Amino acid sequence: MQNDNIKSMKLYNFIDRVYNELRELGKATSGPLSVNELSSFDQLHYHGTQAIDFAIKKLNINHKSKILEIGSGLGGPARYLAKKTGANITAVELQEDHHDAAVYLTKRCNLDSKVEHICGDFLQLEFPKNHYTVLVSWLALYHIPNRKKLLNNCIDILKPDGHFYVEDFAFFKPFDDN
């Protein structure tokens, strides 16, 4: 599958659900939001915030951590990490509609000083070498067909003593060059 195809697929269309949930909360258009109010519908992976708490504990994520999330979706994990740990997060999302919603929700949670959202293809973006202490991804890497480039990019931007945490589908066969 080509990355261009992924960009046009609309892999997940949760945007309407988010705005419907906000209407149900009486917070459809304005005013502050809390991370807890969003966490039941902005986590696009299994086990919601429990999965993030597990990563926080395993990796000892704290306010000194510099985190990059690959495939950040609506920004739920990034906001939760920032709120719970005080860490700074760079959240990369390929789909523009998800990115736009993530930016909007992060601003409403007043976490835009802790979470930087970037819309783009992780394989094409440039990040500082040896910069991040933690890379995370929940159910996103299997959408990236060029795993060799993906992993090489991760190695380049991760500090030598850093951690790479992934929850994803796995294939039980050897990887090829793609």
Please name every model-derived segment.
Residues 1-36:
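N-terminal, positively charged/glycine-rich alpha-helical extensions of SAM-dependent methyltransferases
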Residues 36-46:
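Class I SAM-dependent methyltransferase Rossmann-like catalytic core
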Residues 45-63:
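Conserved alpha-helix/loop element of class I SAM-dependent methyltransferases that forms part
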Residues 66-70, 74-124:
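Class I SAM-dependent methyltransferase SAM/SAH-binding core
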Residues 125-135:
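A short acidic, Gly/Pro-enriched loop at the edge of an enzyme's catalytic core
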Residues 133-146:
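A short SAM/SAH-binding and catalytic strip from SAM-dependent methyltransferases
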Residues 148-163:
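A short glycine-rich, Lys/Arg-flanked "PGG" loop and its adjoining helix->strand segment in the class I
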Residues 165-178:
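Conserved class I S-adenosyl-L-methionine
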